């Protein structure tokens, strides 16, 4: 079999030509752009010397405001001021269950759109406007056009969310070199590969609590290879959620059940300010409408404990996935503005029993890592380290009985390609439905459907003779292509998995947890399903044989065979695996004798009229 070569998308074919590459952290709360100048990464400022661009877009009557200029409109005009658009990326309207002040309308393929003064705007379009601001900032600062960009995404972004990010970049006029997981970018920024001269492998935890997402990754650096051993996270857990918990507490203190959109915006702004101030102060005052509340550190810690517990639970699970103990971890790296909180740092310190690394500005570390990677991919840097991201969830296809055949397991390093042969179930089958799924369960009904396509033109053959090679290929951005090819005829078909909307905020977490909780149950159920499929195949083959050669059996033999057949059918109505297997064996006792009679008949038929000398010569 030929080796499959997968190159980094967009990599420069002219390595000696210096080209402008940027790294972009498209964040929930803030976004940044960085580049490598004279061999050193640098976060680029705007004309007012600001590094952070708040991820906010306001649509006015005749103009659009971005970033800091859009901030005042969060309270003054909340319905037309889009904040934290990243939380809406790749989601359906039904998936968005958290409170927000926007008027969402359905659009094609159930993707939501914001009803604004400037018309309907999709999350992709709004993200594109933020990316365009960062692209313009880079080109103004560098006085040169940008040739390519690496854009970071949460490790737990699924296929739809990654594709939405790529679409936004395309709308912004950016050439995407690669989508890079945010924790992986942080590891690059810290230069953890510089410790590769040590004799032992080095393991690192990247704890990334941003504005809207949480990711934790365990990375290992060994013999020049930088590999993500395991990832976990939550697509809707971050600083925004801490703000909402403070708002919930404040409402309870003030005996308020429901807030208007305008008042809710006031509470959110006050909560965010209080959270930030508590990083350096013991207590703060929240000015809310006509009331003032005092919030101290112990109270704040108790308020957000439920969110911190979720992050710690994910950390422990990822450690188990990587088959590591706490003593195997050399360093813990903090990423994301929310890790500035003393309460977050305290929780991380306690669970990992060591002081976490936070020497690089946690708001900037991801953009810095992205810029270093972009500089490598564009061809400006020859770095010896190899960076391997991983698939967050397993990928497979549906087989008979509604079972999942896994081709690529979760936490497999990407880019990756896997091939496997399948065959037909029925005689004369000329088409095969390929149903692609994502998840950790053994039954299709418990996994997420990613797409379907049909391979037509399979030559009619006896069941089990056709050879269909199915290939799953995941590129460096985590985007999946599935193809199928029939060996004898060469007919083929494929699908690029680009679903119209992604997992809901809890779906990714749910798929993983259910996979662990139901592992034993799924194993038993899979055994039952496989046993039933095999039994049904025996019955179908017997039915076909009886249609042709039933006359070979006398009445007693036929009655015995039919009795065994009906007994097996009755057992298939239940779920006793041993009883089904016993019934299959009893059927085979009778069907094997029938098969011998059939074989003799067909040999006699084949040799009829053939002289012995002719037969000997032909052999």
From Swiss-Prot:
CDD domains: ASKHA_NBD_HSP70_HscA. One of its GO terms (biological process) is iron-sulfur cluster assembly. Gene3D superfamilies: 1.20.1270.10, 3.30.420.40, Actin, Chain A, domain 4, Substrate Binding Domain Of DNAk, Chain A, domain 1. One of its GO terms (molecular function) is ATP hydrolysis activity. It holds the Pfam family HSP70. The keyword ATP-binding applies. Keywords: ATP-binding, Chaperone, Nucleotide-binding. It comes from the Bacteria. Belongs to the heat shock protein 70 family. Chaperone involved in the maturation of iron-sulfur cluster-containing proteins. Has a low intrinsic ATPase activity which is markedly stimulated by HscB. PANTHER family: HEAT SHOCK PROTEIN 70KDA. This is Chaperone protein HscA homolog. It comes from Acinetobacter baumannii (strain ACICU).
């Amino acid at each position: 079999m030929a080796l499959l070569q997968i190159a980094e998308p967009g990599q420069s074919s002219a390595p000696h030509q210096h080209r402008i590459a940027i790294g972009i952290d498209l964040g929930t709360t803030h976004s940044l752009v960085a580049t490598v100048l004279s061999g050193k990464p640098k976060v680029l400022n705007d004309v007012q010397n600001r590094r952070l661009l708040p991820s906010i877009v306001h649509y006015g009557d005749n103009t659009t405001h971005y970033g800091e200029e859009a901030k005042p409109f969060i309270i003054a005009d909340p319905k037309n001021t889009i904040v934290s658009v990243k939380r809406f990326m790749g989601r359906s309207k039904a998936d968005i269950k958290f409170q927000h002040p926007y008027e969402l309308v359905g659009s094609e393929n159930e993707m939501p759109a914001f009803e604004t003064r400037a018309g309907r705007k999709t999350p992709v379009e709004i993200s594109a406007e933020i990316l365009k601001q960062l692209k313009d900032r880079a080109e103004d600062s560098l006085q040169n056009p940008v040739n390519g960009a690496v854009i970071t995404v949460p490790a737990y972004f699924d296929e739809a969310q990654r594709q939405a990010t790529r679409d936004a970049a395309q709308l912004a006029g950016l050439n995407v070199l690669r989508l890079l997981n945010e924790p992986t970018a942080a590891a690059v920024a810290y230069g953890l590969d510089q410790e590769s001269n040590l004799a032992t492998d080095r393991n690192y935890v990247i704890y990334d609590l941003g504005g809207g997402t949480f990711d934790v990754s365990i990375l290992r650096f060994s013999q020049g290879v930088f590999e993500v051993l395991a990832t976990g996270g939550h697509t809707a857990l971050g600083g925004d959620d801490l703000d909402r918990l403070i708002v919930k507490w404040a409402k309870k203190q003030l005996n308020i059940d429901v807030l208007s959109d305008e008042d809710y915006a006031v509470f959110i702004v006050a909560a965010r300010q209080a959270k930030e101030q508590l990083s350096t102060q013991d207590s703060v005052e929240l000015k809310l409408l006509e009331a003032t509340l005092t919030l101290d550190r112990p109270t704040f810690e108790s308020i957000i404990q439920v969110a911190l517990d979720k992050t710690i639970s994910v950390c422990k699970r990822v450690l188990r996935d990587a088959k590591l103990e706490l003593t195997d971890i050399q360093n813990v790296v903090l990423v994301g503005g929310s890790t500035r909180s003393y309460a977050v740092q305290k929780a991380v310190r306690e669970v990992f029993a060591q002081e976490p690394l936070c020497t690089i500005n946690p708001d900037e570390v991801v953009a810095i890592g992205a810029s270093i990677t972009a500089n490598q991919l564009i061809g400006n840097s020859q770095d010896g380290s190899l960076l391997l991201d991983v698939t967050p969830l397993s990928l497979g296809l549906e087989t008979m009985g509604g079972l999942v055949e896994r081709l690529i397991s979760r936490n497999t390093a990407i880019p990756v390609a896997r091939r496997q042969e399948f065959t037909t179930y029925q005689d004369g089958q000329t088409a095969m439905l390929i149903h692609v799924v994502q998840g950790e369960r053994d039954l299709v009904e418990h996994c997420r459907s990613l797409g379907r396509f049909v391979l037509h033109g399979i030559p009619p053959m006896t069941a089990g003779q056709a050879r269909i090679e199915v290939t799953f290929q995941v590129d460096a951005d985590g985007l999946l292509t599935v193809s199928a090819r029939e060996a004898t005829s060469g007919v083929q078909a494929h699908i690029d998995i680009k679903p119209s909307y992604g997992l809901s905020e809890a779906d990714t977490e749910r798929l993983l947890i259910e996979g662990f909780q139901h592992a034993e149950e799924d194993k038993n159920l899979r055994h039952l399903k496989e046993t039933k499929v095999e039994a049904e195949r025996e019955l179908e083959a017997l039915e076909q044989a009886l249609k042709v050669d039933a006359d070979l059996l006398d009445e007693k033999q036929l009655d015995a065979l039919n009795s065994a057949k009906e007994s097996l059918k009755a057992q298939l109505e239940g779920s006793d695996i041993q009883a089904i297997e016993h019934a299959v064996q009893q059927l085979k006792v009778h069907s094997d004798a029938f098969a011998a009679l059939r074989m003799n008949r067909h040999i006699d038929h084949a040799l009829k009229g053939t002289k012995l000398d002719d037969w000997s010569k032909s052999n």
